[in-house]
Amino acid sequence: MRNALRPVLFRFVLLCLLLPLAGCGFQPLYGSKAEGGSGAAVALNQVAIANIPNRDGQVLRNLLTDRLYQNGKPTEPLYRLAVEMRQSETALGIRRDATASRTRLDMLAHYVLRRASDNKVLIDSNAETSVSFNQLVAQYATVTARDDARGRALHELSEQIMTRLALYFGTTQP
């Protein structure tokens, strides 16, 4: 009898914990707004991404493109996103022969979102991340580890930029 009541009690407690969320104004980030206005997902599809120099910039632009253009590239975008990147490497672990055994890769992306109609700056912000990788004796392994670290850093930068854009479009009417 006792085990039979456990699922019912669990559901009741879960309902009691989730019930306050209904009144707090919580809404999905990428959902459409309750007033019938466009949500973040619609606005994100109207952002044109400027070319970003160098290979890492190209990869970051492709990651952003994959996330922004769920319904295809806009023909007349309402917003323009410009991104500038900087990166640096710092040796963390030093071997007895004065070579690095571990390296930290820092990447910073400065991005500006402008309204296309009047060139007004809507967002002017930075995204930054740090990843590390091992410097191995085998050169190919080090190159592979560095490339993997770059990929992780670029993915993190794209996630930060996307989240910031979605929050902006989800909370304001530009």
Protein language model regions, located:
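Sec/Tat-exported extracytoplasmic proteins
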Residues: 67-72, 115-117, 160-169
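C-terminal motif of bacterial Sec signal peptides marking the signal peptidase cleavage site
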Residues: 19-23
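Bacterial N-terminal signal peptides that target proteins for export
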Residues: 1-13
